[in-house]
Amino acid sequence: MAQFYSPNRRVTTRKAVPAKNLTVTVASLDPFGQGVARHEGKTVFVTGVLPGEQAEVQLTEEKRQFSHAKLKRLLTPSPQRVEPPCPHFTRCGGCQQQHAEITLQQSSKTAALMRMMTRETGIELSAASLIAGTPYAYRRRARLALYFQAKEQRLLMGYRQSNSHDLVDIKACPVLRPELEALLQPLRDCLSQLSAVKRLGHVELVQAENGPLLVLRHLDPLHPADEQALRDFAQRQGVSVYLAPDAESLTCLHGEEPVYHVAGLTLAFSPRDFIQVNDAVNQQMVAQALAWLDVQSQDRILDLFCGMGNFTLPLAQRAASVVGVEGVTALVEKGRENARRNALSNVTFFHQNLEDDVTQQPWAAQGFDKILLDPARAGAAGVMEQITRLAPKRVVYVSCNATTLARDSKVLLAAGYRLANVAMLDMFPHTGHLESMALFLHDTGMRKAQ
């Protein structure tokens, strides 16, 4: 995922090496958007270069089998090199690939996904589908760090530099939805005037269907005058404002509960709930999952790691019944609320840690025609055997980590499923992050014979 600010993110500082310049020709991009070159038999990863380019680079890290380097001087530019529109690119750690044409980014990510799946499963895939939206103005959620610079007596608001704790003060961010980018300067001005300006942690911006909202993390109780200043800001800018005095609490200072739309449904969510950052790709992803599952009116469908119902509720519109299983209690409650909101009575949500033994759970004994799962980066190792025992005709696996998708795929393949389709989801353009989804089919005759 893009290296947007996270309060818990650990930063590793690489060991410095003596300055050494090389001239290399870049052969390809790695999955994270770094250029890959060879020098004296060793692989060299270079940030900021593209395939076909010749460049003078400086080594920053040396290992036995590979080195890292930074670009010093571009000797032969690629025709696929473009001018980054962001004034903070190369300093900000949020985006890594704005210098590359979007088609090159997408083809490199797709190739990386295919290589991973082939290496782990042994299956030669002919092609992967591409699901993508606009490369800019797509991000409907971001978290920005806040830091009061005592020497300059000013508030910094922005993202971390790559591989650094240093904060880049952001004046523009073209990957943000325009409604959120337009808030950057007025929000900075407002926060700078608060008496608590030295005790602010971060601010989250979210673009909901019913308007933008912000969540302000403050380290001390706010003075009533500060709260009133935030209310005035909210009214002037037409935003909802939430206060977060700690990691658990959340108070609405002004505005209404946010909602988003998917597959013609309206889903309410808490500002801290997980929703997909890229709305356009989420819409296409849900539509593709429904098409791959080939949902019929008589189907019973299981949705694992279901969240608040991003897939569950669109499935329930089409199937006879749907069961959603999720490990976060608040999301289960929100899923039930959203089912009621959309008048869907054929869906049942269960709270269950899917990393535990699930065989004794009431939903695990039910029969299902089709299964969808959308786990976190760790994958779904704990439930893959249970999925094969349920023997659904179709399985759609949505993944934010191609490595665990490939690993878990082997369980399905060993049980007689075949990998019928793979798609690369460009959820985060200009970053090294890719998401993916895969369709597995089980031949009925083979299943009966087992």
UniProtKB/Swiss-Prot annotation:
Catalysis performed (reactions): uridine(1939) in 23S rRNA + S-adenosyl-L-methionine = 5-methyluridine(1939) in 23S rRNA + S-adenosyl-L-homocysteine + H(+)
Highest taxon, organism lineage: Bacteria
Any single GO BP term: rRNA base methylation
Key words of the record: 4Fe-4S, Iron, Iron-sulfur, Metal-binding, Methyltransferase, rRNA processing, S-adenosyl-L-methionine, Transferase
PROSITE patterns named in the record: SAM_MT_RNA_M5U (PS51687), TRAM (PS50926), TRMA_1 (PS01230), TRMA_2 (PS01231)
Binding residues for [4Fe-4S] cluster: C86, C92, C95, C173
A GO term for molecular function: rRNA (uridine-C5-)-methyltransferase activity
Active site: C400 (nucleophile)
EC numbers, comma separated: 2.1.1.190
Boundaries of every TRAM domain copy: 15-73
Gene3D superfamilies: 2.40.50.1070, Nucleic acid-binding proteins, Vaccinia Virus protein VP39
Binding site for S-adenosyl-L-methionine: Q276, F305, N310, E326, N353, D374
Cleavable signal peptide: none
Function: Catalyzes the formation of 5-methyl-uridine at position 1939 (m5U1939) in 23S rRNA.
PANTHER family: 23S RRNA (URACIL(1939)-C(5))-METHYLTRANSFERASE RLMD, RNA M5U METHYLTRANSFERASE
Family recorded in the similarity comment: Belongs to the class I-like SAM-binding methyltransferase superfamily. RNA M5U methyltransferase family. RlmD subfamily.
Name of protein: 23S rRNA (uracil(1939)-C(5))-methyltransferase RlmD
Annotated organism of origin: Pectobacterium atrosepticum (strain SCRI 1043 / ATCC BAA-672) (Erwinia carotovora subsp. atroseptica)
